[in-house]
Swiss-Prot record:
Pathway: Isoprenoid biosynthesis; isopentenyl diphosphate biosynthesis via DXP pathway; isopentenyl diphosphate from 1-deoxy-D-xylulose 5-phosphate: step 5/6. The gene is ispG1. Its cofactor is [4Fe-4S] cluster. This is 4-hydroxy-3-methylbut-2-en-1-yl diphosphate synthase (flavodoxin) 1. Converts 2C-methyl-D-erythritol 2,4-cyclodiphosphate (ME-2,4cPP) into 1-hydroxy-2-methyl-2-(E)-butenyl 4-diphosphate. InterPro entries: Dihydropteroate_synth-like_sf, IspG_bac, IspG_bac-typ, NO2/SO3_Rdtase_4Fe4S_sf.
């Protein structure tokens, strides 16, 4: 009997960059900024006035790992639904307000954890800041100043000609200064654009000129594939420089998919402890097994596993054994069979038809032992 240490860290490894120093605000129980972990959020796609459907979608988002959720509030019926939704939601609810300032006050009174305001389209917003600041301060409600390229203040469009990085940053800082005049600084800021290059530069300028926590987002990023690429590029560029305190991946998909992508981005940058990670080769003429099918079946079989486990699925003898040895669990396939590795040690060889079943069984065994040993221990698997 041999005990093989798994080598799985109990804490995240060093992140890609030192975090930008920023203020900390509380969005309900979730800290944002001030060195708090980067949080992942999304937005419901239901009519907020449909309380049951909205709470159901929030429950699905919560189960997927969402930490903060935003709900639209374009009508009085939506505003009337906010108290129940804010009270029954498992995670903090942010009301998203455009056009009508009265809904800002309704959201604050409803007990929402925060309110997003769009200074570019709320009627007479500058004149309402004093009242909004007082109401938010009285209720302890943070405000997100959400500047968006598609609804930029006309004064700035006239000045810059289009939604440039300078225009986005100036808009946000101007509105923040109005709140500051009324001694309100419980603020976070976003400056979103659908072009990742413009968006990245806008956030860089903003980060250099203020210490407010920043909400990262590429607006109208597009369908799943395109939106994922845009968000990964933009967030990676900023988070790798320590810029960003909470993220929302905008996709034209069910919102749960946004959370999956957001979590993967943070894990890839070591800003969150990694969960299950499948490493698989892209396949080539050397492959002696259907790598695509194998990787998909292993991924499906381990879906929902939360332990930090790296599983390598390799299709040939060139890189297969080396990659499998580097993983916590892996298979190197060839000649109709697969060598199963646990932390660099070959524990068994199985027929090709048994590879998926064996990998899933071994992963479950490792996960069970990790849970038994506790998150802070140094788990090991015993093989004979």
């Amino acid at each position: 009997m041999t005990a093989i240490p798994l080598g799985l860290p109990g804490v995240p490894v060093r992140p890609i960059a030192e975090r930008r120093v920023s203020r900390r605000i509380q969005v309900g129980p979730v800290a944002v900024g001030g060195g708090a972990p980067v949080s992942v959020q999304s937005m419901t796609t239901t009519r907020t006035s449909d309380i049951g459907a909205t709470l159901q979608q929030i429950a699905e988002l919560t189960a997927s790992g969402c930490q903060i959720v935003r709900v639209a509030c374009p009508t009085q019926d939506d505003a009337d639904a906010l108290p129940v939704i804010a009270r029954k939601s498992q995670i903090p609810v942010i009301a998203d307000i455009h056009f009508q300032p009265k809904y800002v006050f309704a959201a604050i009174e409803a007990g929402c954890a925060a309110v997003r305001v769009n200074p570019g389209n709320i009627k007479q917003f500058d004149d309402k800041v004093k009242e909004i600041a007082k109401a938010a301060k009285d209720h302890g409600t943070p405000i997100r100043i959400g500047v968006n390229a598609g609804s930029l203040d006309r004064r700035l469009l006239q000045k810059y000609g289009r939604a440039t990085p300078e225009a986005l940053a100036e808009s946000a800082l101007w509105e923040a200064s109005l709140f500051e005049e009324h001694d309100f600084r419980d603020i976070k800021i976003s400056v979103k654009h659908n072009d990742p290059v413009v968006m990245v530069e806008a956030y860089r300028q903003l980060a250099a000129q203020c210490d407010y926590p920043l909400h990262l987002g590429v607006t109208e990023a597009g369908p799943a594939f395109q939106g994922t690429i845009k968000s990964a590029v933009a967030f990676g560029a900023l988070l790798s420089q320590g810029i960003g305190d909470t993220i929302r991946v905008s996709l034209s998909t069910p919102p749960v998919e946004e959370i999956k992508v957001g979590i993967q981005i943070l894990e890839s940058l070591n800003l969150r402890q990694r969960g299950l990670e499948i490493v698989s080769c892209p396949s080539c003429g050397r492959a002696q097994v259907d790598v695509y099918k194998l990787a998909e079946e292993v991924t499906a079989g381990l879906e929902g596993m939360e332990v930090p486990l790296r599983v390598a699925v390799m299709g040939c003898v060139v890189n297969g054994p080396g990659e499998a040895r580097e993983a916590d669990l892996g298979v190197a396939s060839g000649n109709g069979k697969g060598q199963i590795f646990v932390k660099g040690e070959v524990v068994k060889t199985v027929p090709e038809s048994k590879i998926v079943e064996t990998l899933i069984e071994e992963a479950m065994r490792i996960a069970e032992q990790m849970e038994k040993d506790g998150a802070s221990g140094a788990p090991a698997v015993t093989v004979s």
